[in-house]
Amino acid sequence: ASQIPFFKVVFADPGPVLAIMGASLLIVVVGVLDDIWDLDWTIKLAAQLGVAALVAWQGVQILSLPIGGITVGSPTMSFLLTIFVIVLVMNAVNFIDGLDGLVAGVSLISNGVFLIYSYLLARETSPSNYFNLASLIAAVLVGACAGFLPFNWHRARLFMGDAGSMLVGLLMAVAGIAVTGQIDPGSFTDIGLGKSQLLPAFLPIMLPFAILLLPLADFTLAVLRRVSAGKSPFTADRKHLHHRLLDMG
């Protein structure tokens, strides 16, 4: 990727790239250990917080909200908000990994659209390397999920497990933050888009998050359901939305 002209700018500052690679390796190792030995949920959560902090520490942070240019307010708040979002998305994706092909299919669709738009956005606005970084991550996810999905389709011959689902969630969160958290709404004005056109311009960027709305809702309901019953929030059950839809036929 470093030899492709469009992606060369990403490697000009190796810090974020190395942090993402290191975080990916760590979360895969923890996921594999969990798949083998069923680690306590506190260990998994600690690992998720650690990898999220590593990525945020190297500058991939939510600095502003794209609509209206609202800034987060302080470096500490930006750091903590980034960690929260990454951990939230990782667990939301992990929680929907209950049916053959579900995570790989959702990721393939959302990141396919995300890749096209982030690439076009990078070309039109001449942005910083964070736009190109988002495109690179989306391209990696599209390729990985497209290659994995045929083997994970019902009846699956390969399973993603916690190692795969947490990795997909991590990369999806980082790619989304790299664009939406670093974007300058003024750049759209420079290319002729007025304020009334900002929302349509950002809709494709928000598509991956829109697709994750259902997993996030399922994650929230699952945590509330399990905690209220005095169980670990990571205890498996068959009350997820996709299980209920499957039972309904």
State where each predicted segment sits.
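Membrane-helix boundary/helix-loop-helix interface segments in multi-pass membrane proteins
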Residues: 1-11, 31, 38-87
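Alpha-helical transmembrane segments
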Residues: 1-29, 79-82, 102-248
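Glycine-rich, flexible loop/turn motifs
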Residues: 32, 61-68, 98, 154-156, ...
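Generic detector of well-ordered alpha-helical packing
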Residues: 36, 49, 92-101, 163, ...
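Short, highly charged low-complexity linear segments
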Residues: 60-65, 87-92, 122, 177-180
